[in-house]
Regions:
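Conserved alpha-helix/loop element of class I SAM-dependent methyltransferases that forms part
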Residues: 1-10, 24
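A short glycine-rich, Lys/Arg-flanked "PGG" loop and its adjoining helix->strand segment in the class I
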Residues: 88-100
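Conserved class I S-adenosyl-L-methionine
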Residues: 100-142
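Conserved beta-strand/loop positions that form the S-adenosyl-L-methionine
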Residues: 14
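A conserved beta-strand element that flanks and buttresses the S-adenosyl-L-methionine
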Residues: 75
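Class I SAM-dependent methyltransferase SAM/SAH-binding core
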Residues: 18-63
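Substrate-binding/catalytic lobe of Class I Rossmann-like enzymes that use SAM or dcSAM, i.e.
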Residues: 131-202
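Core SAM-dependent methyltransferase catalytic element
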Residues: 218-230
């Protein structure tokens, strides 16, 4: 989308975490409202507290206190698929807040070969077991093991096969080929220690046309991110 269109806009970042995306957008809009259910909101406030146009709320996306039309633009990137409610229903429920919405939801690997989905099925079984681990030191030890034993080898294989144009056939490679090791490690932690993970197909997202005037699904990574217009 055209970020220049946010000049003069009031923006909401739902599930802001530590404020990574808000840091990028704060200087591009009139006001940005950051919302998160966890104590990450305090980290976001520490990072962005010097921005006079930033407001911080600790709250539940499923029970927001904002009136219809409170914002010009709402976005939630990589959050709604971790909520205990169907993520597309949550998207529909947020429609009154703004005229334009941007979301990123985990994809169901519907545009990938079948073996991607087989690997995902195995990883999902592993995640459901690992998410019960509570000790932080144990979690980070497991994260390191998965980083070096699964993620980096696959990314390395993808990089090698990319020399002959076959890199995209390797799981994880396309998304992580330009990412730093620290970013990949954080993603491994987030991926395996969450209890709830929903995934959607492109066809699932298309059903949002029953609620929004227009739904534009990006053909580019990460899958799927899409813009909804009221």
């Amino acid at each position: 989308m055209d970020l220049g269109a946010l000049r003069g806009a009031r923006v909401a970042d739902l599930g802001c975490g530590i404020g990574r995306w808000a840091h990028y957008l704060a200087d591009r809009c009139r006001e940005i409202v950051l919302v998160d259910f966890s104590e990450a909101i305090f980290v976001a406030r520490r990072h962005l507290g010097d921005r006079p146009n930033a407001l911080f709320f600790m709250g539940d996306i499923l029970a927001l206190p904002f009136a219809p039309g409170s914002f010009d633009f709402v976005y939630s990137l990589g959050v709604l698929h971790h909520l205990p409610a169907p993520c597309l229903d949550v998207v529909r429920s947020l429609k009154p807040l703004a005229a334009r919405h941007l979301y990123f939801l985990y994809y169901a690997l519907d545009n990938r070969p079948a073996y991607f989905r087989w690997l995902l099925a195995g990883v999902t079984v592993l995640r459901k077991g690992l998410c019960r681990v509570r000790g932080e030191r144990a979690r980070w030890a497991i994260t390191k093991f998965l980083l070096w034993g699964l993620y980096l080898p696959l990314i390395g294989l993808g990089r090698a096969l990319d020399l002959v144009g076959l890199g995209r056939r390797v799981p994880l490679y396309e998304f992580y080929r330009d990412r730093s090791r620290a970013r990949i490690e954080q993603d491994v932690y987030d991926r395996f220690f969450t209890r709830i993970e929903q995934r959607v197909t492109r066809a699932d997202i298309e059903t949002l046309r029953d609620t929004f005037r227009a739904v534009t699904i990006s053909p580019d990574l990460p899958y799927w991110h899409f813009l909804c217009e009221r």
